[in-house]
């Protein structure tokens, strides 16, 4: 059972969520070089298809990523960090499992207006590549998207993206 309360968590972004996973012992950090095309997902699938009980599953944070062409990435990849098991999901939703349905219904029925921030004050900005710039490795291949089924998928795909939002 996750031991922090909603008031204690109060984290504002994915970095803080990762810190909470680490503090709760729900994160396995892989710092050795991992090939995103051949090694990343088989390692993660091992825990789901290898007979590990759900409560013993962990999130994986890969920090030293390469691909089959030798390209190195400076972006870490978190896999299973939002819903690897019920404890991880509960931690991210910031509510008890028994309250998940009510929490989702409340969030869907009570959307909040976006908080518009002046571009100069924004903590992050879009980086947009168009036209010929996409041919120089700045398209989807600039992001270390793993290949889900090595040997079967011919490229990385965004098949089930997650969105990080904040519920006031």
Predicted regions mapped to residue ranges:
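Extended, highly charged
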Residues: 1-168
């Amino acid at each position: 059972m996750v031991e922090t309360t909603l008031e204690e968590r109060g984290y504002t972004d994915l970095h803080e969520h990762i810190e909470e996973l680490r503090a709760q012992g729900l994160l396995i950090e892989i710092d050795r070089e991992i090939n995103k095309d051949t090694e990343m997902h088989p390692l993660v699938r091992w825990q789901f298809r290898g007979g590990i009980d759900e409560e013993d599953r962990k999130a994986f944070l890969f920090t030293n990523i390469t691909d089959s062409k030798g390209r190195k990435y400076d972006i870490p990849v978190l896999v299973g960090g939002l819903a690897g098991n019920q404890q991880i999901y509960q931690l991210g939703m910031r509510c008890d499992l028994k309250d998940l349905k009510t929490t989702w219904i409340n969030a869907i029925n009570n959307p909040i207006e976006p908080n518009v921030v002046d571009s100069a004050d924004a903590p992050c900005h879009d980086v947009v590549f168009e036209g010929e710039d996409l041919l120089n490795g700045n398209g989807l291949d600039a992001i270390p998207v793993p290949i889900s089924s090595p040997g079967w998928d011919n490229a990385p795909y965004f098949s089930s993206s997650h969105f990080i939002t904040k519920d006031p």
